């Protein structure tokens, strides 16, 4: 016999049962943040695998994850952040996995219970799977249960690179049983098995392909994504944008040698280069100042906006006399000091 759905697992949902529809809505169905990061890298911060029923395409959780995927559909690579995801619904595990794998692929875990089995393979398949997009999953010791199932499935299907540390190791479904005197005991009701590994991640967790601390994992994954994208064939401007994003990321994480900011401070026509403590910034009139990150050799990038660079020019005596702004789209402007 086959049970209709996999049971909740350790780490799935709040301690007193499944979230209410209103709590799910307020939590945006686990989707904390979706954005396109520098270098055209997609990023989804997913905190929960929200539940929904197959056969009902208008259910809010399903529409929410589809909207998130649509927002990053044009990106060159995608990072899904599971570092703070404790789990959730097997239905979402299967559906989201199908967004990156071929329809009907034999990759999904099957849960074995005393009363039967249940597969995480989705009853409805994602309509527009991205089969070639480089995919990176961030995991930590907080990553549990359904989030681990998702990472385990895509790792063993060789469809995603796992970045971070070993996950929680909570594979087996079950629940708390009253042991009396105010004590409870977790009792497993079954166990998942992968058709690829013929085992699961219970106790050991999902092991990373690339080790990183929870704090450094996002930048490690971004660098891996940009390096992969740069190996692919791209239009010239897109390749330049990716390369500048990677160089800026490296500069922000491993700053170059100390820079004499005083050399650059001053007015350049309508623009001002100023110094605030150990930071250099660019400002036009009353507009918010933009911080600059040094790339070395009189070259800077706008912090957080690596598609714009500033190159300072020096006169024959070595004094800074002007700067040029350059865009990865080919645009440029020139500003003389005091002009």
Q: Model features per residue range: what roles?
A:
Residues 1-41, 241:
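Extended, small/polar residue-biased N-terminal targeting/export presequences
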Residues 234-339:
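Peripheral terminal and inter-domain segments
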Residues 87-138, 142, 172-178, 189-195, ...:
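Gly/Ser/Thr-rich loop/hinge elements
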Residues 44, 80, 135, 154, ...:
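Terminal peptide-recognition signature
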Residues 54-76:
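A short, well-ordered alpha-helical element
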Residues 199-202, 206-245:
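Low-complexity, Gly/Ser/Thr/Pro-rich intrinsically disordered linker/tail segments
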Residues 44-45, 74-86:
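Short acidic catalytic loops
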Residues 28, 32-62:
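STAS-typified acidic loop motif
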